[in-house]
Regions:
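Short, flexible active-site-proximal loops enriched in glycine and acidic residues
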Residues: 59, 142-149
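Short, conserved catalytic/metal-binding motifs centered on acidic residues
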Residues: 47, 93-102, 137, 183-191, ...
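Short, positively charged, Gly/Tyr-enriched micro-motifs
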Residues: 16, 20-75
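Intrinsically disordered, low-complexity and often Lys/Arg-enriched segments
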Residues: 1-8, 12, 16
């Protein structure tokens, strides 16, 4: 059946990253990947519905939650990134952007902060709600498919939190470590001397859309 074929393909795919993990962790990797793809959702209750396990739903949710709480192991992350590297072109382009996850009705979420809600804000009006910042870095594969190489949810309310720039630098360093040389593409929100200096320090090429009030000095001439 189509379901069986899909499960086999996902199992083969996830084995590339979970080969060195324990048996329960390998099962979790396959279950969560299949469940999200089959349900089109990241809600654990929806994922459970697709797994059709004999255990009670709440027990399956608890099992998945425990594994998620552990995070992604270093070995699985390394195996994933090496696979992504094989999919990329010889001249990789890395896209970095910030987004937000809004939780307006949340009260018990850990380190819940205040973020600018991108879906409701405009160029003349900013709408702020409870939520988290998300920093994402991805590349285009040789088949022009976007694939993540860095993804982090963060909040200024976290203990020992430094700045959003610190997270962006981590994304840049991840790309630099993985590819050695790449072209970084970023929106006007990254029009910042700190970004230019960081990318220059690493010897990377970059394309950053400038803000309208940016003054550019080129060959001793100022361009506005």
């Amino acid at each position: 059946s189509n379901t069986y074929i899909l499960k086999r393909k996902i199992l083969t795919f996830t084995k590339k990253f979970s080969r060195k993990l324990s048996k329960p962790e390998r099962k979790f990797t396959a279950d969560i990947t299949y469940g999200m793809l089959a349900s089109g959702s990241c809600l654990l209750t929806d994922v459970c519905d697709q797994l059709h396990e004999p255990s009670q739903k709440i027990n399956v949710v608890d099992r998945l939650s425990r594994h998620l709480e552990k995070g992604v192991s270093a070995s699985a992350t390394s195996a994933y990134l090496q696979q992504v590297k094989k999919w990329s072109s010889s001249e990789p382009i890395i896209y970095i952007d910030d987004s937000d996850v809004v939780k307006p009705d949340g009260y018990k979420f850990e380190s819940l902060g205040i973020v600018r809600n991108g879906s409701e804000s405009t160029s003349t009006k900013s709408v702020y709600k409870k939520g988290y910042h998300v920093t994402e870095a991805c590349i285009l594969t040789s088949a022009n498919h976007p694939v993540s190489i860095f993804s982090k949810i963060h909040s200024s309310h976290e203990k020992d939190y430094k700045s959003a720039n610190t997270i962006t630098f981590q994304a840049i360093e991840q790309g630099n470590s993985l590819f050695g040389k790449a072209t970084f593409v970023m929106d006007r929100g990254y029009d910042d001397n700190k970004m230019f200096l960081k990318l220059d320090e690493l010897g990377q090429d970059y394309v950053i859309r400038l803000k309208s009030n940016r003054k550019l000095l080129y060959l001793s001439l100022i361009h506005i």
